[in-house]
Amino acid sequence: YGYSRHAKALPLYTRRDAQRAIARIVPLPPGRDALCGSVRIGFTPVGHLLGACAITLLHGGERLVFSGDVGRSNDLLMPAPQQVPDADVLLVESTYGNRAHPKDDAAAQLAQIVSDTVQRGGSVLMPAFAVGRAQALMLMLQRLKAAGQVPTELPVYLDSPMAVQATALYHKHRRLLRIPAREAEHLA
């Protein structure tokens, strides 16, 4: 932070560097390996967000597995994480590593809060991460309306350009979600 060898900090890479790197990208679907020099590479879906995978690198008989966030087996939108291969070295993100997720019924809590607030004539404002959490909240509200647990005429607005774009991606790739197609249609 604040350190550079240059009087005016220079970017780490140029637009041309980025374009050259993008031109070299080769899609590799989960479950299929590829060889890059002497390193075998593979991806395993981890159920966190659309496309989230652990990467496995195999070189000289040693296996390294790296993953960012790993999803939960009972996630509302995403399928459960797949088992990653055994590893000699495992690197994994650990924001919630020392916490157990509460087993509370989030939908029931949300229904109660929304219903109580609407009865008082109030509005509900729910800040949420634009990718993943916003889509899960939209689905939960959709299900609560369908079940009559919150007023069906309750307007719901997604007021974040990034969340709207992410929701469009979730809809486009709805086959990767764990929800039925009819529910995924409402994500658009």
Q: How would you describe each model-predicted region?
A:
Residues 1-136, 142-149:
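His/Asp/Glu-rich metal-coordinating catalytic cores
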Residues 1-2, 147, 167-188:
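Acidic, Ser/Thr-rich peripheral helices and adjacent loops at domain boundaries
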Residues 15, 84, 163, 184-187:
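Alpha-helix initiation and N-capping motif
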Residues 133, 151, 155-172:
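Short, conserved secondary-structure transition motifs
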